[in-house]
Design a protein with these regions (language model features):
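Metallocofactor- and cofactor-centric catalytic cores in central/energy metabolism, strongly enriched
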Residues: 1-95, 108-146
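Active-site gating loops and adjacent loop-to-helix segments of metal-dependent hydrolytic enzymes
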Residues: 101
Length: 146
């Protein structure tokens, strides 16, 4: 059985859509879907949504959830990362600072000045995740949706 970890599982839109799509593949319909997020409330919401997807699709999948990233990475085959470093309130700075200098930016952009701001916030955490993966699931594939 494949183990697929979702780091930043509280990102409800990404998690729900990806889990639903993954479970439609015959090879993955019995996967362990392991959710992790630092926000317990959002994590529990995502867990319940994923459990509902499993139940409604009658998939033999297992859903687990924890706030301990290292615990959930043990033995993972794939890791989907959908993290947001910093709160959504920092996006205002990502948009307003470039706009002050005549550069229009999309919300959540990953290119241009806002992409640089976002990268500077995100890279340290991504490196921590990569180090954990090297130790705990070195064969796993990472898919970054951040």
């Amino acid at each position: 059985m494949a183990k697929i970890v979702f780091i930043g599982a509280g990102s409800f839109g990404f998690t729900r859509g990806l889990v639903r799509d993954i479970l439609t593949y015959p090879l993955l319909k019995g996967a362990e879907i392991a959710l992790v997020d630092i926000n317990r409330e959002r994590l529990n919401f995502a867990r319940r949504a994923c459990e509902k997807i499993v139940a409604m699709g009658n998939y033999p999948a297992k859903v687990t959830a924890t706030t301990d990233r290292r615990e959930v990475l043990k033995g993972a085959n794939a890791v989907c990362v959908t993290i947001l470093c910093g709160r959504t309130s920092v996006w205002g700075h990502d948009i307003l600072i470039p706009k002050k200098y005549g550069i229009d930016i999309n919300v959540g952009g990953t290119r241009g000045p806002s992409g640089i701001f976002r990268a500077l916030r995100t890279i340290p955490t991504m490196l921590e995740i990569c180090r954990d993966m090297e130790q705990l699931c070195p064969q796993a594939i990472m898919l970054n949706y951040t």
